[in-house]
């Protein structure tokens, strides 16, 4: 059974996460306030960051960078910018 939450990212009612997908207090905040749709948008941005910046999840600094970018994207309204990336034209 899916849960409906008010997604603070999308600013509308949406289907919430099925379980806490990230550890700690940030994970609880994501579970409570971020919809599946918004999380999917973040995962696309995360993949772009990992690929373009050649991040490795083995390195603590790279994981910390991703977490900072995730918080800024999901909770502070800041988009992810990757130098050299040009979005496709519609």
UniProtKB/Swiss-Prot annotation:
Keyword list, A-Z: Iron
SUPFAM superfamilies reported in the protein's UniProt record: YggX-like (SSF111148)
Source superkingdom: Bacteria
Family annotation (InterPro entries): Fe_traffick_prot_YggX (IPR007457), Fe_traffick_prot_YggX_sf (IPR036766)
GO MF term (any one): iron ion binding
Keyword check for Iron: yes
Pfam family of the protein (one): Iron_traffic
GO biological process: one example: cellular response to oxidative stress
Cellular-component GO terms for this entry: cytosol
HAMAP family to which the protein is assigned, alphabetical: Fe_traffic_YggX (MF_00686)
The protein's assembly and partners: Monomer.
Family: Belongs to the Fe(2+)-trafficking protein family.
Function in brief: Could be a mediator in iron transactions between iron acquisition and iron-requiring processes, such as synthesis and/or repair of Fe-S clusters in biosynthetic enzymes.
Identification of the protein by name: Probable Fe(2+)-trafficking protein
Natural source organism: Hamiltonella defensa subsp. Acyrthosiphon pisum (strain 5AT)
